[in-house]
């Protein structure tokens, strides 16, 4: 911020409270300052993207990331449509977003106010791989619009995912103290689960009476089993479920 406008700048309006009474879990409650949202007017876009096994393994052992940037830009343009048909939330599947595109998403979110939820491609170093879920949100800084990135690693890895990663000479580890997050975004409260995580019934119970919407990026072939869990969660938690899966397996829905 230049000197002329320095008086307008303020710290980012974020509040994070950590509830450690839910052992063996930690529940973080994050309040994001910004425009008020009305739940009854919320619009959500779910990206329909084909991700095969090779695409999901990008990022392991320094694999060169190859992704169709034109498709990515078209998703962003369709979601915003020059402000004519703006959605509030845009959801991509697990493993979709390359790290090199993070700045592009932050810029998009800052300018449009659209919150983006996506899984990152694997991050690997020294034989350890990390599957990460991200939330990009617009936030106010005085009279300015800014954008912030929230990210956390997957708490529980599926047995098949562990085997798949091992074939690429990497290792993934479950979190001994799982962390889940609830976001208060202008009055709309939402949570996130990354694919296999919501097989944990105790983790699902953490969000009871806490959220209006749950976003679940995933790459999952067992759509029958997971569909039953999704429908059960919606009834038990009285929340909207937003599921973004690879188009190879389908079942992306709200």
PLM features: residue spans?
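Short, surface-exposed connector motifs at secondary-structure boundaries
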Residues: 84-90, 184-189, 209-214
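C-terminal beta-strand edge segments of enzyme domains
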Residues: 1-29, 232-233, 245-254
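CN hydrolase (nitrilase-like) catalytic-core segments centered on the catalytic cysteine
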Residues: 88, 102-117, 198-254
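Active-site-proximal beta-strand/loop segments in catalytic clefts of secreted hydrolases
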Residues: 49, 94-95, 119-122, 155, ...
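Active-site catalytic loop in hydrolytic enzyme cores
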Residues: 9-37, 128-209
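Active-site-proximal beta-strand elements of phosphoester/diester hydrolases
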Residues: 41-63, 151-153, 188-197, 215-217
């Amino acid at each position: 911020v230049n000197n002329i406008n320095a008086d307008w700048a303020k710290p980012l309006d974020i509040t994070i409270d950590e509830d450690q009474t839910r052992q063996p879990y930690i529940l973080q409650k994050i309040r994001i300052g910004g425009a008020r949202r009305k739940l009854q007017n919320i619009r959500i876009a779910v990206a329909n993207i084909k991700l095969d096994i090779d695409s999901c393994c990008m990022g392991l052992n320094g694999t060169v990331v190859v992704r169709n940037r034109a498709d990515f830009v078209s998703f962003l343009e369709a979601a915003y449509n020059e402000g004519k048909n703006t959605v509030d939330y845009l959801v991509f599947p697990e493993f979709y977003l390359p790290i090199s595109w993070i700045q592009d998403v932050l810029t998009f979110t800052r300018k449009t106010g659209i919150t983006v939820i996506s899984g990152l491609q694997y991050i690997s170093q020294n034989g350890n791989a990390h599957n990460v879920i991200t939330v990009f949100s617009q936030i106010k800084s005085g009279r300015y619009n800014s954008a912030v990135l929230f990210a956390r690693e997957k708490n529980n890895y599926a047995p098949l995912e562990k085997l798949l990663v091992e074939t690429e000479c990497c290792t993934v580890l479950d979190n001994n103290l799982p962390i889940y997050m609830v976001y208060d975004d202008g009055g709309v409260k939402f949570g996130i689960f990354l694919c296999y995580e919501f097989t944990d019934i105790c983790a699902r119970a953490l969000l009871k009476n806490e959220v209006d919407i749950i976003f679940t990026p995933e790459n999952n072939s067992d759509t029958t089993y997971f569909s039953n869990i999704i429908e059960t969660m919606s009834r038990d938690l009285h929340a909207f479920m937003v599921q973004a899966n690879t188009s190879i397996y389908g079942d992306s829905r709200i």
